[in-house]
């Protein structure tokens, strides 16, 4: 078996980028939102692993949901209407303060705004999106 490791960026994942891999004279088109794909190459398996290069505060769960941990000062958000969670891909994510609770750690979900879900029947299908889950840590 041959194993190739690719390190896509977060923007690659959110943009549904497909990488063209040239291996032993053959071209393989790798959808970067998959974590592992198997191809046949000259009677052997070619395994392509996608291990994203992510910031420390971001992880990806088994359902391709993005988990983004952010920290905000409780005192600072009292005067704001919304908090900016950052720009991911081409979208900026803003959470209305009115939807937050008075608790130290909470989650806020942007449904169907994340990475493409894995379709085992069509690996290039990018029509269904995962969620982006912000884990908000409030501190003094």
Predicted segments, located by residue:
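Post-J-domain flank of DnaJ/Hsp40 co-chaperones
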Residues: 1-14
